[in-house]
Amino acid sequence: MTENEGNDKKIEGSNPKKKLNVVTFTGAAGLLGLAVSFAIFTFKSHKQKSKKKGLPGCDTVCVNLSAKEILDLAEEIIHKSTRVHDAVALVSLDKLSYENVVLPLAELEARQLSLIQCCVFPKMLSPHDNVRKASTEAEQKIDAHILSCRKREDVYRIIKIYAAKGESISPEAKCYLQCLVRDFEDNGLNLTAIKREEVERLKYEIDELSLRYIQNLNEDSSCLFFTEDELAGLPLEFLQNLEKTQNKEFKLTLESRHVAAILELCKIAKTRKTVAMAYGKRCGDTNIPVLQRLVQSRHRLACVCGYAHFADYALDRRMSKTSMRVIRFLEDISSSLTDLAIREFSILEDLKRKEEGEIPFGVEDLLYYIKRVEELQFDLDFGDIRQYFPVNLVLSGIFKICQDLFGIKFEEVTEVDVWYHDIRAFAVFDSGSGKLLGYFYLDMFTREGKCNHSCVVALQNNALFSNGACQIPVALLIAQFAKDGSGEAVPLGFSDVVNLFHEFGHVVQHICNRASFARFSGLRVDPDFREIPSQLLENWCYESFTLKLISGYRQDITKPLVDEVCKTLKRWRYSFSALKSLQEILYCLFDQIIYSDDDADLLQLIRSLHPKVMIGLPVVEGTNPASCFPRAVIGSEATCYSRLWSEVYAADIFASKFGDGHPNLYAGLQFRDKVLAPGGGKEPMELLTNFLGREPSTQAFIASRTNYSL
C-alpha cells in the first residue's frame, strides 16, 4: 500500500467547511508557496472541471478521476515536485535554514501524497479498464520521478550541509531530517562514484534474480494424477473442479489451494506424502542456484553500504535493529514452546497410530491430524457459525467496540463521490470533544476489475503545516466479501470476521495518529510495529462479550451465538498453537540465517534446522523448501519474523491492559494517546515501554498458548 497526503485547510471541530483556504506566503516562508500552490491549484482545476463532491474539508482527496485527469495530474505532480526540489538545490549555503531546506520538502511530501494516491489507487479498484491502465501508467511515471529526486546530488548536498550545522529543531523534525538524509544515502549518494555504480549494478542484479526465482515458480506446471480412492476424504465439490483424464484419474496441480486441501483433508497417507514431496521439490534444480546468487548479491550490497551482512542492512531501521536480536527472539520463543509442542505432537501421533498403524509420522501429516483432532475435540460447525455474522451487524459491532475502547464515534457521510455504487464513507470524531479526527471509505465486496486482496490504504496522512493548517487522515479499507445472486451480502465466515477486525485496526491506527509530519503518520511507521494495533484488535474476536455483540442469526439477528460456541472458539484459537508457531519459526530462522551468514549452505541448512526446531521431525524426504520460499526472496527478505514479532507484543499489550476481554476506555485512550498518536516520529520500543510501564515481554504470548493447551 502507498501512503499519501494533501489539503491545506485547517479543520476545526466537527463542522468542517468545504471551501479551501488559500494562504499567501511572505518572507522566509516564500519558498513554501511552491508546495502550497502545488496542492491548491492542481486540485482546483480538476474540481472545477468535474464538480465532483469530495469529503468535507479534504479537497485534495478525489477518488473518481477519469483516465485523462489521472495522467494530467501525474504530470502536474512531477512538474511541481521538480520546482520545489530545484528551489531547495539553489538555496545559498550561507542562508541555509530549516525553513528553506527541510520545511519545503516536508510540506511538499505531505501535500503530494494524497495527490499521488488519487492517481495510483484506482488501478486496484476502478471498474473501468481505461482508468486502471492510466493509473498504472501514472504510478510508473511518479515512481520514476521520486527515484530520480532521491538521486539528486545537488539537493543531497544542501540537506547534508544543513544537517551538519546541528541547528536546534524539534525531536520530530530532527527525525525527519535524518530520514531525508537516508533517502539519498539509500541510493548511494554518500558513496564514491565507483561504489555507487556497484550499488546500482547490484540492485539491478538483485531485481533480475528475484524476478527469475518468482517466474520459475509461476511457470512451474508440475501435476500429479490420482484415482478417486487415492483422494478419499476430499469433498465432492473439490473433485468436481479437477480435470479428469480418460482413464478416470484426477489431475492435481501444485497450486497452493490444491496442496492445502490434500494435506488437510485427504485420508490416504501415501497421497499426502506424494503431494508434499512434489510440492517441496518444485524448481529445486533451477531456484537453488538462483537463491544462492541472490543471497550473495545482497550480502555484497550490504558490505558496500557499510554493513556486516544483508540481515543487519535490512533491520537497521526496524524495532529489531540487528539479526542477532531477531535470532535470539525466535530461539527464545522456540525453546519456551518446545515442551508444549511435544505434548501436542504426542496427541497427533497417538491418533495416527490408531488410524494407520505404525507408519512413521511425517511433516506431511501435521495439517491432516490437527484437523482430525480438532473435529474430535471441538463441537464447531463453521458453516453454521457463518450464519451468525451478517456483514452490517459485524461492522456495527466493530464500531461499538472501537467507540468504547478508543473514545471515538462514527458517522456515515452520504452524497459524496465514490468509484462504485456500494462504497461507503464515514467520518470519525473524538467522543469527548466532538472534534473531527478523519475519514475512511469501505470497499467491501468483490467485483470485476477489483484487486483480490484485503488491505488498508492511506489516502491522506495527518500533518501540521507552518501556517497553522492541519491536514486530517483519510483511509480506505478494502475487503473481499461476497454477494449472492440477488446482490445481497453473504454472511461472513469466522476467518472473514477476524480479518475485518485486523484491517479495521489499521483504520483506527491511521485515523488516531497525530504526527506533525506526514512521513510519520498513520501506517508510515516501523514495519515491525505496523501490525501491532491490528493484532491487538484481533484479540476481541475471541472474547464472549464481543462475539455476542457482533453475532446474530441470519434469519433472526436477536439470537447471538450461544455461550458454549463462544468459549469453544477461544479454545480452538490456541489448538496446536505451539506446533504451528514452531513451523513459522523454522522458516523465519532459515530466512534470518541465510541473510546473516554469507557462507550458508542452502541445501544442508534446512535439513539440519528442521529437526532441531520441529522437535525431531525431519524435512519431507527429497525436498528443499529453499527452492519454493518466495517470502525470503521478495517482500520479506531477512524480515519474515516481523509478523510473529508484532503478534507477540500485541499479546503482551492485550494481557496487560485488556485482560478481562471487555473494552477498557481508560487503557484504550492511553493506547491511543501514547502509542497511536505519536506514530513513526518516536522509537516504537519507547512508545510501548511508556504505555506498558516496562519493556515488552514474550511471557503473555507463551502463557496464552500454554493456558489453552489441549
UniProtKB/Swiss-Prot annotation:
GO terms for cellular component: cytoplasm. Its main location: cytoplasm. Binds 1 zinc ion. Pfam families: Peptidase_M3. It is found in: Cytoplasm. Keywords: Cytoplasm, Hydrolase, Metal-binding, Metalloprotease, Protease, Zinc. Disulfide bonds: none annotated. GO terms for biological process: proteolysis. Zn(2+) binds at H502, H506. It comes from the Eukaryota. One of its GO terms (molecular function) is metalloendopeptidase activity. The active site is at E503. It catalyses: Preferential cleavage of bonds with hydrophobic residues at P1, P2 and P3' and a small residue at P1' in substrates of 5 to 15 residues. PANTHER family: PROTEASE M3 THIMET OLIGOPEPTIDASE-RELATED, THIMET OLIGOPEPTIDASE-RELATED. Involved in cytoplasmic peptide degradation. Belongs to the peptidase M3 family. This is Probable thimet oligopeptidase. It comes from Arabidopsis thaliana (Mouse-ear cress). The lineage of its organism: Eukaryota, Viridiplantae, Streptophyta, Embryophyta, Tracheophyta.
